[in-house]
């Protein structure tokens, strides 16, 4: 079993957090969006989103900026992945795929 644990060594535990993983997954697949859109897509409270986004900003994985909005709002806060965030997400997904492939080979 140690072999499987070794596959995830070096992976940032902050990205393994389910909500942070979903935030980064949505930004990776859909691209930058407004914080309001992200909150709706995740179905989380503002407080929950804020604490998780703050942690991702601290790690340098996402960035926030004000941009033109659609509808009645002229400006809204946008969120997107940084280059570091994209790289770390890709590394995490590769490690998870490697782990799943290893487990599938073992069960076959």
PLM-predicted stretches and their roles:
Residues 2-6, 26, 83-108:
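Amphipathic alpha-helical dimerization/coiled-coil segments
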Residues 31-32, 53, 61:
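Short alpha-helix boundary/capping elements
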Residues 60-67:
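A short, conserved structural fragment
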């Amino acid at each position: 079993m140690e072999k499987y644990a070794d596959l995830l060594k070096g992976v940032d535990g902050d990205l393994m957090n389910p909500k942070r993983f979903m935030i980064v997954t949505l930004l990776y697949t859909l691209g930058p969006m407004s914080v309001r859109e992200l909150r709706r897509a995740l179905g989380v409270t503002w407080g929950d989103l804020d604490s998780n986004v703050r942690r991702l900003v601290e790690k340098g994985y996402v960035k926030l900026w004000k941009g033109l909005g659609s509808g009645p709002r002229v400006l809204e806060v946008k969120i997107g992945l940084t280059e570091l965030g994209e790289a770390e997400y890709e590394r995490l997904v590769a490690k998870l795929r490697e782990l799943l492939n290893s487990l599938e080979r073992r069960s076959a």
